Amino acid sequence: KLFRRTEFLTLNGNGKFEAYANRDSLKYRGIYGLEDIRTMYRGTIRKVGFSRAWNIFIQLGMTDDSYTIEDSESMSYRDFVNLFLAYSPNDSVELKLRSYLKIDQDDIVWDKLIELDIFSATKKIGVINATPAQMLQKILLDSWTLEEDEKDMIIMHHKFGYELNGKKHQIESSLVVKGENQTFTAMAKTVGLPVAIATLKILNKEITTPGVQLPITKEVYAPILKELEEYGIKFTE
């Protein structure tokens, strides 16, 4: 049911997205000193249609990692999909899938499946004795690997609701980072730059807190966030 329970999010200039719950969020109340709050929700943001498309894989059983499939190495993507559908001497794999899951041909979910080239009769899985989940992973890796002319994008969105002097308030804060190319990706920037900046500040004794630290103390996160703004990594409210 996880991927059926999504909420939509629109970010000006960047389009419409959807978010679904990402594991247990309650443990973060203690980490951030928010023990008394009534609601805390952490989600994953994806393009609209992702959750419905992923839920198709779940319904078919393609995410199962508990058993292996013989001759998986030589199977085509099309053969893999057909494993999870009823036999029909006349209907195509595409028609069987649409009929079984009640997907219209002009549905955005159908477009996403076509983008994966998941009905290809020539592309091979190439993984020996793989589980369904491993076979699906191979298909996704082949399709989702960033090409030279492609760029990635990372979005983080915070929504804070609070009450002050009997009046309810809400603050929304968004971070949008876009990659430059296949090498200088948004992922590389947002993962690598904070670590690099923190390392330099420790070496220069600008951060002196000893031991392994979570970046939740102001001495650690404040100077790093400030310097990240020079690289275009900043939140807007």
Regions of interest found by a model, annotated:
Residues 1-237:
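C-terminal catalytic/substrate-binding lobe primarily of soluble NAD(P)-dependent oxidoreductases
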